[in-house]
Regions:
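Short acidic, glycine/serine/threonine-rich loops at helix termini
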Residues: 52-56, 106-112, 207-213
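Short connector loops/turns at beta-strand edges and beta->alpha or beta->beta junctions
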Residues: 46-49, 152-155, 203
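N-terminal catalytic cores of NTP/NDP-binding nucleotidyl/phosphoryl-transfer enzymes
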Residues: 2-54, 167-174
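Divalent-metal (Mg2+/Mn2+/Ca2+)-assisted nucleotide/phosphate chemistry catalytic cores
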Residues: 65-66, 72, 82-197
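A charged helix-plus-loop insertion that forms the helical arch/lid used to bind
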Residues: 54-70
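Conserved phosphate-binding loops in nucleotide/dinucleotide-binding enzymes
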Residues: 62-63, 99, 103, 182-187, ...
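Structural motif
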Residues: 7-8, 41, 95, 165-166, ...
Length: 224
């Protein structure tokens, strides 16, 4: 259990210039988290969006240009400001960070040696998003296969920089969240790391509501 105030985060990809109603529950979790005196961290996936999360996807995501991703990030910030307080005068002001800031500067050899060595390919193949692609014999790129490692590294970086001890996310992110918890425990030898997932808001046919899927209900009025 948490005995002191801490920080927790949720990651959002930048595949669109707005969020949809499927992101409403995660946003409300961060809002309540802040209302109890903790510090919410919004992680923009400026780096990982260049790769694409395979979770809940039947096919490889379309790769966006860096220019489009940067444009989306600016507009997404306005959505977050409707739910969270970024007032720097408050002790637990929300933080907005971008994983491009650390992922873009990684040295491949050092990363494979220091971080990649902590991951088991056997375990990665058991992740539901990976397992389903392979079962259906659908294409899974090397980029997507490594997504869970990068998300785990995000958690590790936030733990180091902001003492972030909790990652929130949708139920489809459980495997990725656990990967981050395991990485931190292996490197920092601590047990005070947590993951919390929430149910997904789905479409009428039971599919995950996503920004790139048909029928998305947007949180920005200019997208409605």
């Amino acid at each position: 259990t948490l005995s002191t105030k801490t920080s927790g985060y949720i990651g959002f990809d930048c595949t669109s210039d707005s969020l949809h109603v499927g992101s409403l529950l995660p946003l409300m979790i961060l809002k309540h988290f802040q209302s109890f005196g903790h510090t919410p961290i919004v992680l923009l996936g400026g780096g990982t969006t260049l790769i694409g999360d395979p979770s809940g996807k039947d096919e490889t995501r379309k790769i966006l240009s860096a220019e489009k991703i940067n444009s989306n990030k600016k507009k997404l910030k306005k959505v977050f400001e409707k739910f969270l307080s970024f007032d720097s005068s408050k002790e637990n002001a929300a933080l907005l960070v971008d994983n491009y800031d650390w992922l873009s500067n990684l040295n491949l050899i050092n990363f494979l040696r220091d971080i990649g060595s902590k991951f088991s390919v056997n375990k990665m193949l058991s992740l539901e998003s990976i397992k389903q692609r392979l079962k259906r014999e659908q294409n899974l790129s090397f980029l997507e296969f490594n997504y869970s490692i990068l998300q785990a590294f995000d958690f590790f970086e936030l733990f180091k920089k902001y003492n972030c001890k909790i990652q929130f996310g949708g139920s489809d992110q459980w495997g990725n969240i656990v990967s981050g918890i395991d990485l931190i425990k292996k490197i920092k030898n601590t047990e005070q790391i947590f993951g919390l997932t929430s149910p997904l808001i789905t479409t009428s046919n039971g599919k995950k509501m996503g920004k790139t899927a048909d029928g998305a209900i947007w949180l920005s009025k200019d997208k409605c």
